[in-house]
Amino acid sequence: MEIKRFGRIREVIPLPPLTEIQVESYRRALQADVPPEKRENVGIQAAFRETFPIEEEDKGKGGLVLDFLEYRLGEPPFPQDECREKDLTYQAPLYARLQLIHKDTGLIKEDEVFLGHIPLMTEDGSFIINGADRVIVSQIHRSPGVYFTPDPARPGRYIASIIPLPKRGPWIDLEVEPNGVVSMKVNKRKFPLVLLLRVLGYDQETLARELGAYGELVQGLMDESVFAMRPEEALIRLFTLLRPGDPPKRDKAVAYVYGLIADPRRYDLGEAGRYKAEEKLGIRLSGRTLARFEDGEFKDEVFLPTLRYLFALTAGVPGHEVDDIDHLGNRRIRTVGELMTDQFRVGLARLARGVRERMLMGSEDSLTPAKLVNSRPLEAAIREFFSRSQLSQFKDETNPLSSLRHKRRISALGPGGLTRERAGFDVRDVHRTHYGRICPVETPEGANIGLITSLAAYARVDELGFIRTPYRRVVGGVVTDEVVYMTATEEDRYTIAQANTPLEGNRIAAERVVARRKGEPVIVSPEEVEFMDVSPKQVFSVNTNLIPFLEHDDANRALMGSNMQTQAVPLIRAQAPVVMTGLEERVVRDSLAALYAEEDGEVAKVDGNRIVVRYEDGRLVEYPLRRFYRSNQGTALDQRPRVVVGQRVRKGDLLADGPASENGFLALGQNVLVAIMPFDGYNFEDAIVISEELLKRDFYTSIHIERYEIEARDTKLGPERITRDIPHLSEAALRDLDEEGVVRIGAEVKPGDILVGRTSFKGESEPTPEERLLRSIFGEKARDVKDTSLRVPPGEGGIVVRTVRLRRGDPGVELKPGVREVVRVYVAQKRKLQVGDKLANRHGNKGVVAKILPVEDMPHLPDGTPVDVILNPLGVPSRMNLGQILETHLGLAGYFLGQRYISPIFDGAKEPEIKELLAQAFEVYFGKRKGEGFGVDKREVEVLRRAEKLGLVTPGKTPEEQLKELFLQGKVVLYDGRTGEPIEGPIVVGQMFIMKLYHMVEDKMHARSTGPYSLITQQPLGGKAQFGGQRFGEMEVWALEAYGAAHTLQEMLTLKSDDIEGRNAAYEAIIKGEDVPEPSVPESFRVLVKELQALALDVQTLDEKDNPVDIFEGLASKR
């Protein structure tokens, strides 16, 4: 099929690798492929360097030192697929070469020590933890550094905040008090800053010289009593203020203040914080702490420059500004590598504590590095992070786009981040610096709006964690091909033009250019422009970039369109959209859903499970295909060959399509012929009418795989057994089980069918005399077992596609304590579209299938072509997502011309171009009608007359010309399939790309007659998972009260809820065909009575004759 490209803006640079934020970050943290001597001091290398050497605390013993030399990662013990199958973590062993130095003798013992395992990242940027694919979401937080913010309580005054890395030191606030004293707040304690300045060695003259320009502000520092002290005395005074309970000793005070501001192991601004502080204060720091400790004295690094800036800001000196904390120059991304390294550092600190304890306990001669180190705390810290951290999430792999988007997510939540409740509007809002860095559209709709966002398409995260976006340099009005990646702070210094600025060759064509400076629009001459956007795509995320005609959609609906694409279920017969945006191929390639050739060669063999390619150098390389693999969300991930034996392939050519891809293009749904018209109220309120033809053609059929699991345990009564020998069951019920009691592959199973047979020993009840006699004769044989088999839950079923048995003792299998074996059964369902399923397009138009019409009842074109879907026109104007109408028009042209289109966002097909294509399509459409011997029907002419009155067509033209006029508006005359008559007005018809979403009615359908009850309230449980009932709440009770439906209401509150005796009696009566008896006392009333009695109130229940009634009588036996 021919693909026609729109778009005038040249691609200057390709998109960066879409999973780069994950893959690069983790590669840099581990540096596994870098020789030890060439490793940078980042990631786990830096963590080792910070923790080691570990010295013995008791200096009197002569002293042991454990030092670190290098580390290496071994090979992972199990491949990825085996890890998924056996619930293992895909990880590699970590070894460190350590040396133990005896300081007094100079003896050195060297050893390679095993330090536990570190999870490895798969090539697509996710992890396999306990058999499940997981993604570590990047976190956005306030960058460490020095910040100046207005004091909310006192206008005209400011607070200076010095912020370290999370959990790497205290926040410090400096402010000028109302009485003029400059105070410092640390660990919730306030004291005069002058005390610390004296400790740092400043005297009155130095401060007067450095800060003399700010006359009265400096007076707040001039405390004569403090300057009369020596720095050592000021230190003791400071210590007593900060630690009032501790004895004021010099060494204690030095150690405390050192740990607070000068110890690199306990206080860390981080590289980003150091960079921000230097940039803000215009200084150079020697390290990442606030002060140094040299020759027994503290030396200042940050405090005086911060104070100088605070005074200048208060005094209104030009060039000194407050900080915008939502500016992306002040927020940074903590990617996987950094998050893991933080946990690794915590684990190493625990390991070091253990080492010091063992140094004190063991005899020096017998100690070796291996005996000193216990790797458990390190491994536990890493395991905790990957399995339980808020940022370690179950990977969303509904389709390739959802897994790609998950890896590009940025969250402000998580440890050290914000909480939903605390985050205000400012943090959630779009900021001008988001341009090209964070997508302004894609974010969830609920409580997390604005806190969870997505990285823009071209954005990259630099080594300090700041997001950079690319710009082309412009020199003297000429656009060069030099591309510069800039942070938000750097960007603020320049004037930047848009990507669609008109160019002649490389020179800016317009005399006046719309550009932006510090996020504000300005109109400038071409010579004033310094940079230019590289592409209109750079503003939005990958998901949003997949919405054609995005520029015609309201942002709220674009947000829904972006989010719903990730909920699209992969279909059996996937189709790429007729109207694409140009990113579809890249998404499939970077998500690793499809398979591509690694070199030039020839296809040697193809079957359903593998492709073998013979490369130029003679090597035969086998590519195994993933067939019907269950994703985390239960969708089927399946790869299908797209090559034939003997075909020549070049490097990067497609070998096999993956889920939701067609010939390497992302295919999340289907192109269907849509009519936008009301239809007898069936498409009221976003409901959708579809043709039965879609079901016959399997257009919206998807495969879903459910996993069922059962364990056989050792119980107190005896071991459970997986067996075919189940008591009280007919042979028919066991026909699909193999001799071991596991269902056979290929069996069709329905609700209630046995998947795995299991027997458990019955609980011991007091045996009857007859049983005791039998046991004394036959021994233990008479003890019985009960059937506890795994059965298909209600409302589910399908075809068994795979079974897995994991037994204790099998290689690599780790089962929970007490579990002997685990059996898993995978059941696949083929789901056709049905009433209640949710459909959506890319523009945020979503709805539920309300009616499936026979194809003969659907409206059809004059040539008999029936439409597939009928959408309600009222869904468009108020939602302002007109992109879908333009897509439909272009889709109509594509339908008749047999073309596909690539229409990039903000640079796509314009109205005249669509009209030109529609004119060509009309010739094909009408030419075909003429060729089949019928031109314009007289009933069509009546519709055209009505169209004349509405001003849709020009009066006086021939019917054919009028039909063409309508066609250029994307409208045609439709006939009602039920009556054969034309529909009154012209209707917009065309191809629209519609997806079937993950919310399928089959998963939500649920019914209950009787079932489990809550232990306390005795009311039915809630929810499908618990096989619960529907809650009849307070407001529903009011509704029945308002109608006076007394008997229905009483039944709701008693028999159908928590009247234990009544419901049992009612059940019995229904079975026997008798009348349902009167209700008795509900359990909630008894609970109320008991609660009142617990409050020492004497509550009695009386009948109508005032006789006492015991509502608790005989209850124990009935429960």
From Swiss-Prot:
InterPro entries per UniProt: DNA-dir_RNA_pol_bsu_ext_1_sf, DNA-dir_RNA_pol_bsu_external_1, DNA-dir_RNA_pol_su2, DNA-dir_RNAP_su2_dom, DNA-dir_RNAP_su2_hyb_sf, RNA_pol_bsu_bac, RNA_pol_bsu_CS, RNA_pol_bsu_protrusion
Enzymatic class: transferase
GO cellular component, as recorded: DNA-directed RNA polymerase complex
Keywords: DNA-directed RNA polymerase, Nucleotidyltransferase, Transcription, Transferase
Single GO MF annotation: DNA binding
Domain of life the protein comes from: Bacteria
One GO process term, biological-process aspect: DNA-templated transcription
Catalytic activity reported: RNA(n) + a ribonucleoside 5'-triphosphate = RNA(n+1) + diphosphate
CDD domains the UniProt entry points to: RNA_pol_B_RPB2
The enzyme's E.C. designation: 2.7.7.6
Known function: DNA-dependent RNA polymerase catalyzes the transcription of DNA into RNA using the four ribonucleoside triphosphates as substrates.
Family, per entry: Belongs to the RNA polymerase beta chain family.
Description of how the protein assembles with itself and partners: The RNAP catalytic core consists of 2 alpha, 1 beta, 1 beta' and 1 omega subunit. When a sigma factor is associated with the core the holoenzyme is formed, which can initiate transcription.
Full protein name: DNA-directed RNA polymerase subunit beta
Source organism per UniProt: Thermus thermophilus (strain ATCC 27634 / DSM 579 / HB8)
